[in-house]
């Protein structure tokens, strides 16, 4: 089962739209909490921990079929028949997979800076850095940073990963399952061959300085999502929702409100 948290609007009514928010690799549901806060007046939100992340279950060989089943079970548990879905990076691929296999349950799809394609291995340094952190001997976050930085050189990436480090009693732990993520990585950067199309409204939000979605991906996107539109947030990279949150959140809210009017 997936761990999730519900954020209902302050003036909750049954006609308010629902939005499921799915984070990226090495993240947790907290990563997209700022979006839920920004939409709190108009949109009910469900924040999800992916398997092997946060408080969700550990799965040794995770793939998109596993994530899809978790999302299906979560909607059933919540009593929701339809919702909008928003995913960033790995979460975007999970949201796309869900939409393509559960069109009637996905009112619309919002994909943040990822495409429905297979990607090359690009996290080797991150894996090496995480495995280099000796949780049994570190005594502070500074110790962890020193060990992590032997392989991970970019300060923003270092700080993002260290958000997943916490102290439980006398031991340090990650909020994600490093070994299981590494084992599942080939399946997660891959993209399966899918014949279905998702014909409901679809919005791709792309970082203007990011290389995760390029013109070369347009054909793959349109073949699966014929009812697609795209917005580019200039001056942002892959972490577009964190770099320009006000712009990102307005795009998301405008998309949902237009469909709800």
Language-model-detected regions and their locations in the chain:
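Alpha/beta-hydrolase fold catalytic core
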Residues: 1-19, 40-43, 80-81, 186, ...
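Catalytic histidine-centered segment of alpha/beta-hydrolase-like enzymes
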Residues: 236-245, 249
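Active-site glycine-rich loops that stabilize anionic/oxyanionic intermediates
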Residues: 24-27, 89
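Conserved serine/cysteine hydrolase catalytic core
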Residues: 170-224, 232
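The conserved beta1-alpha1 loop
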Residues: 20-24, 206
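Active-site loop/oxyanion-hole signature of alpha/beta-hydrolase fold enzymes
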Residues: 5-7, 11, 33-37, 46-86, ...
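Conserved alpha/beta-hydrolase catalytic His-Asp/Glu region
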Residues: 121, 136-192
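Flexible "cap/lid" loop of the alpha/beta hydrolase fold
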Residues: 96-100, 107-138
């Amino acid at each position: 089962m997936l761990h999730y948290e519900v954020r209902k609007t302050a003036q909750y009514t049954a006609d308010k739209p629902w939005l499921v928010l799915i984070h990226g690799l090495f993240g947790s549901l907290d990563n997209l909490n700022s979006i839920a806060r920004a939409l709190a007046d108009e949109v009910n939100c469900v924040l999800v921990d992916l398997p092997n992340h946060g408080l969700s279950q550990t799965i040794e060989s995770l793939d998109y079929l596993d994530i899809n089943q978790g999302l299906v079970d979560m909607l059933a548990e919540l009593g929701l028949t339809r919702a909008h879905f928003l995913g960033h990076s790995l979460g975007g691929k999970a949201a796309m997979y869900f939409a393509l296999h559960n069109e009637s349950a996905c009112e619309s799809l919002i994909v943040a800076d990822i495409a429905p394609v297979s990607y090359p291995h690009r996290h080797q340094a991150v894996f090496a850095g995480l495995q280099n952190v000796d949780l049994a001997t570190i005594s502070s976050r500074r110790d962890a940073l020193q060990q992590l930085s032997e392989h991970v050189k970019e300060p923003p990436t270092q700080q993002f990963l260290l958000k997943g480090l916490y102290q439980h009693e006398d031991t340090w732990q990650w909020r994600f399952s490093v070994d299981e993520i590494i084992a599942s990585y080939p399946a997660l950067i891959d993209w399966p061959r899918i014949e279905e199309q998702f014909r409901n409204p679809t919005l791709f939000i792309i970082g203007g300085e990011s290389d995760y979605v390029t013109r070369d991906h347009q054909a793959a996107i349109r073949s699966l999502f014929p009812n697609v539109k795209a917005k580019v947030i200039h001056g942002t990279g892959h972490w577009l929702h964190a770099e320009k949150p006000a712009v990102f959140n307005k795009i998301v809210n405008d998309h949902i409100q237009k469909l709800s009017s």
